[in-house]
From Swiss-Prot:
Disulfide bonds: none
Keyword Ubl conjugation: no
InterPro entries per UniProt: ESAT-6-like_Myco, ESAT-6-like_sf, T7SS_ESAT-6-like
Chief localisation class: secreted
Protein species of origin: Mycobacterium bovis (strain ATCC BAA-935 / AF2122/97)
Compartment(s) of residence: Secreted
Keywords from the named record: Secreted
The name this protein goes by in its record: ESAT-6-like protein EsxL
One Gene Ontology cellular component: extracellular region
UniProt keyword Zinc, yes or no: no
Assembly mode: Strongly interacts with EsxK to form a heterodimeric complex under reducing conditions.
Record gene name: esxL
Length: 94
């Protein structure tokens, strides 16, 4: 009986997570544009409230980006470790 693991799929999944993290910047910029368009809500684009909201939004996006990127790296590392272990075990049985 042969078991065929697709370690490349795990690596691809990790890469996809990291790519999605990178795409967050475009979403972040789009939200900032919308906030600036509606800046009257906070008292104008230059107001402390508006700038504070934009700053906090940036911090939140940074945390999400860092966590998603780190998770993608961990998924890729796990896939690589499984592939190496599988290869080592497989060669010891040969």
């Amino acid at each position: 009986m042969t078991i065929n693991y697709q370690f490349g799929d795990v690596d691809d999944h990790g890469a996809m997570i990291r790519a999605q993290a990178g795409l967050l910047e475009a979403e972040h910029q789009a939200i900032i544009r919308d906030v600036l368009t509606a800046s009257d809500f906070w008292g104008g684009a230059g107001s402390a409230a508006c700038q504070g909201f934009i700053t906090q939004l940036g911090r939140n996006f940074q945390v999400i980006y860092e966590q998603a990127n780190a998770h993608g790296q961990k998924v890729q590392a796990a896939g690589n470790n499984m592939a190496q272990t599988d290869s080592a075990v497989g060669s010891s049985w040969a």
